[in-house]
């Protein structure tokens, strides 16, 4: 949730926006069957497997049997010659097929689209308007160029949620804007006059979204008002592998929480302008030749600061006058705002490392900053609060989590060097993906064949229903098409006392690696004994899941929608018991890597016109029992016992992680309708703890959290407990949300909570009261240390 002024957000842009007409609940798109012969021609083979294997994806719950999932912009009239205006062709490709467009619907899972852009230069004179559940993907072998015409008048060349020119209403509620991607593009705005508004991408975004491998080029004129990426709202999100040059701002961004990794910005006046946030993790920034690398001064020290916290790690700043410009002080308003932690930062020719309210508080030069911060501290052993501004005892980084001294990371594989002969098609192997047929045997056969032949298994878009465990052996590589879904169904998953995985990655004791990307795993009907994903492999470096999400209920075909599971307080329906555990990384499954994953038990129906709330019951969230685990850009929401549990786990990197407590709690109280069991190291609940834990650290060691947000917005569906107008900012949806039990060497930086009275409970003792850490809306701790 975010309660902010739209005008304030737009004012922060400093750029005049061109809006588009408002059209409430009217769909003027074409039907997939109405294209003329030229537009309906087969996609041109261009050497990239995603394009060359296209055509078999299906949207099984779409009313149009001819609905096209994959669209090549050249099939819709785009020329890519750098001369012809291709704007309309892009918008036709995106909107074709009565899809979920701005103001038309809140969300939809039955009209996905991959919009593919072959190599070439595409002149753009009107904004490209994004639709729900869309992936705009260029050819990574030779990145296509989207070149802004000099006459372009728009909020952004790619607009993720346009504003109406009639009443200013955005196309979508940004905090519910899920399931979208932009990949493999060059956006060139250099033809636009420096003083004319230009932004490459407008991207209000939430979970299960990403921008990856995008280059943005803008004017380097001193009077430029251009910005590369503008984000003014949302509950995100993830970006990686960006390269931005020029402009007033490389990025002008604000969001509840976000993770950015491997971002290069050069020759902007301000590299990154943080408009507002609750918390943000930046890793691998390379900012050079800018006036200010990173600004977080919005609101100022005398007023109400808009930035909650920022954590910046493993980054390099070169030839900038200032690294960080901040407004924090001992008397910051609110007291928990403006917090900053920087760690392992290499400066080259940067005179001022950190400036606060115009004064240099950390000198620069050419040096490496180990760990430094400012804000509220609870250390050692969660004692506090105390204000701090200066060097702090940084985390002792376990060597197994590092590569060349930095936390290990790996970008999502796109297999751009492979030909089509290196792939196996799930549909071609006999799976239907129609959401009705039992595809268990066909899917298992395809998975086994691909691994044995060292090929990549391509799941064309569809819903692949399975009634037994799909075993994923070491060596597997699997990739989906705009979130192809595997759906577990049936009695195999029916006994919560004897849980069974839907997806089993390796068997206990096995070693090896896998790569899995761009897919969803979901359940159908009552499956109280389902472990949605079980990870067992003792893995080599680089084995993991990228953009793989779990969606439990809230979508067509799941039988877990409004009709079956209405949000009636106190009415607990067994047919809506949907999973024992969402994701389990088991003992011995060391080396697992997760990036940009959303493990979600649905709180509302994505295919309902009014996004109506539903009651779905999942026992446990993300359970980690292994060592050397990386968790980048992760969310776990609405599980009855806990969202995250790190149980006897060691050497864990997590950032940014985010949770929400089930909206219906404490009716029924946790752990109901599930039963706590010592077999799974479940929490024991009491009358003083009636809602789920956001994060539970049980006998864990060396847990490093670089940005986290644990949120509780409701009490029995009453949002009043988290109201922005709560007296004195006291938001009391639940008493406590973070439990540290028997754990050592725990450190957290930029840690926020919403709706919680006590932010930390360590060894059964409540610590860190909300009132001492009230930030821009949540409560925030800059530095937490325990168990040293």
Curated annotation (Swiss-Prot):
Name this protein carries in UniProt: Glucan 1,3-beta-glucosidase
Annotated glycosylation sites: 28, 233, 381, 773
One BP annotation, GO: cell wall organization
Catalytic activity: Successive hydrolysis of beta-D-glucose units from the non-reducing ends of (1->3)-beta-D-glucans, releasing alpha-glucose
InterPro entries in the record: Pectin_lyas_fold, Pectin_lyase_fold/virulence, QRT3-like, RHGA/B-epi-like_pectate_lyase, Rhodanese-like_dom
Coiled coil, from the record: none
Top-rank EC class of the record's enzyme: hydrolase
């Amino acid at each position: 949730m975010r309660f902010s002024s739209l005008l304030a957000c737009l004012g922060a842009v400093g750029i005049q926006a061109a809006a588009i007409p408002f059209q409430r609940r009217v769909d003027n798109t074409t039907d997939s069957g109405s294209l003329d012969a030229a537009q309906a021609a087969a996609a041109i083979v261009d050497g990239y497997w995603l394009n060359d294997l296209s055509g078999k994806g299906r949207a099984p719950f779409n009313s149009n049997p001819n609905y096209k999932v994959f669209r090549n912009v050249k099939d819709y009239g785009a020329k890519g010659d750098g001369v012809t205006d291709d704007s309309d062709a892009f918008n036709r490709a995106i909107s074709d097929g009565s899809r979920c467009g701005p103001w038309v619907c809140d969300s939809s899972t039955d009209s996905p689209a991959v919009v593919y852009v072959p190599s070439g230069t595409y002149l753009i004179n009107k904004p490209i308007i994004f639709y729900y559940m869309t992936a705009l993907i260029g050819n990574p072998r030779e990145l296509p160029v989207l070149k802004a015409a000099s006459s372009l008048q728009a909020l952004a060349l790619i607009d993720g949620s346009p504003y109406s020119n009639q009443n200013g209403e955005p196309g979508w509620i940004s905090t519910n804007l899920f399931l979208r991607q932009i990949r493999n593009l060059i956006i060139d705005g250099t033809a636009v006059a420096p003083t004319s508004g230009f932004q490459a991408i407008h991207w209000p975004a939430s979970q299960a979204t990403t921008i990856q491998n995008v280059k943005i080029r803008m004017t380097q004129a001193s009077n430029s008002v251009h910005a590369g990426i503008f984000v003014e709202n949302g509950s995100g999100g993830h970006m990686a592998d960006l390269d931005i040059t020029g402009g007033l701002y490389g990025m002008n961004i604000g969001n509840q929480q976000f993770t950015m990794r491997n971002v290069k910005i050069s020759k902007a006046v301000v590299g990154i302008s943080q408009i507002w946030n609750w918390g943000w993790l930046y890793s691998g920034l390379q900012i050079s030749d800018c006036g200010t690398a990173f600004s977080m001064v919005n609101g100022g020290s005398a007023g109400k600061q808009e930035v909650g916290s920022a954590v910046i790690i493993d980054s390099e700043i070169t030839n900038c006058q200032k690294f960080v410009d901040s407004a924090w002080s001992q008397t910051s308003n609110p007291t928990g705002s403006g917090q900053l932690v920087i760690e392992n930062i290499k400066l080259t020719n940067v005179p001022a490392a950190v400036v606060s309210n115009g004064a240099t508080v950390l000198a620069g030069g050419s040096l490496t900053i180990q760990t430094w911060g400012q804000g509220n501290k609870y250390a050692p052993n969660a004692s506090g609060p105390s204000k701090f501004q200066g060097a702090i005892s940084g985390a002792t980084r376990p060597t197994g989590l590092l590569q060349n001294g930095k936390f290990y990371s790996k970008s999502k594989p796109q297999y751009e060097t492979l030909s089509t002969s290196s792939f196996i098609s799930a549909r071609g192997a006999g799976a239907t993906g129609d959401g009705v047929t039992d595809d268990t045997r066909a899917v298992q056969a395809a998975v086994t064949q691909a691994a044995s032949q060292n090929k990549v298994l391509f799941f064309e878009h569809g819903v692949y229903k399975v009634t037994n465990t799909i075993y994923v052996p070491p060596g597997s590589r699997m990739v989906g098409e705009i979130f192809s879904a595997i759906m577990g169904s049936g009695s195999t998953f029916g006994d919560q006392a004897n849980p069974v995985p839907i997806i089993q990655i390796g068997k206990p004791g096995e070693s090896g690696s896998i790569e899995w990307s761009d897919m969803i795993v979901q359940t159908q009907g009552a499956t109280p004994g389902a472990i949605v994903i079980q990870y067992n492999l003792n893995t080599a470096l680089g084995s993991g899941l990228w953009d793989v999400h779990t969606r439990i209920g809230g979508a067509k075909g799941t039988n877990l929608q409004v009709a079956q599971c209405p949000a009636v307080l106190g009415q607990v329906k067994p047919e809506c018991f949907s999973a024992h555990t969402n994701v389990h990384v088991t003992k011995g499954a060391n080396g697992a890597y997760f990036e940009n994953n959303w493990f979600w038990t649905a709180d509302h129906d994505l295919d309902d016109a009014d996004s109506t709330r539903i009651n779905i019951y999942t026992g446990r969230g993300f359970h980690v029992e292994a060592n050397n685990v990386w968790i980048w850009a992760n969310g776990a929401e609405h599980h009855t016992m806990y969202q995250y549990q790190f149980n006897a786990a060691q050497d864990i990197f997590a950032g940014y992680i985010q949770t929400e407590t089930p909206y219906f709690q404490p009716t029924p109280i946790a752990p109901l309708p599930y039963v706590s069991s010592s077999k799974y190291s479940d929490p024991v609940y009491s009358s003083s703890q009636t809602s789920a834990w956001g994060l539970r650290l049980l006998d864990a060691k060396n847990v490093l959290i670089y940005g986290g947000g644990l949120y509780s917005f409701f009490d029995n569906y009453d949002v009043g407990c988290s109201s922005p107008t709560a007296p004195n900012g006291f938001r009391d949806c639940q008493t406590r949300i973070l439990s540290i039990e028997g754990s050592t060497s725990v450190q957290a930086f930029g840690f926020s909570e919403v709706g919680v009275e006590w932010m930390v409970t360590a060894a059964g003792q409540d610590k860190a009261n909300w009132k001492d850490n009230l930030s821009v809306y949540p409560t925030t701790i800059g530095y937490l240390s325990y168990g040293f």
